Amino acid sequence: MVSPRGPARGADPVGNTLRDEGTIDERESFIDATFAAAKGGGEAVGLTKRGKGVKILAIVDRHGLPLSVSTHAANHHEVTLVQLSFDFYMLEAKPEHLIGDRAYDSDGLDDDLKQNGVNMIAPHRSTRKLKTQDGRHLRRYERRWLVERFFAWLQWKRRLLIRWEYYATNFLGFVQLACITMLLKQF
């Protein structure tokens, strides 16, 4: 894991300014991850069935603007990386509702986030024995396309499609620079 004391600190004033203006609304946030191939190898690269790679984990607000972006080795499951992604969160207040796909359906994750005041909403996996939701909160899941659109915007940056950097902090810097350019378009 890359230390959050690096480039993430530069995004804090931008995020807080946009929040004060009402552009960012963190009450309802969406989480997902995407894969970037790492052709050159390097640190924090995980082997998967698709080859060497990096996982880009993002939390976006209800308008599709990034609130947290982090990079991790691709061989880790997304549930184990959610708490680490809050180290890169650029606002003081955490979201009330965090909406994810079926990969985030975990009782342990639900309990951990509930202790921090965050309600995790994810559809149940087909193998789940005990149902914990009745479906009312899943109406928020329909807007999860916002995080997919964010990744589409992010992958327009050719530099981020394939990781050529050896050091993980350099690649994280490019990812966060792309997110800052998205946020600066809101001014």
Regions of interest found by a model, annotated:
Residues 1-187:
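Short alpha-helical elements
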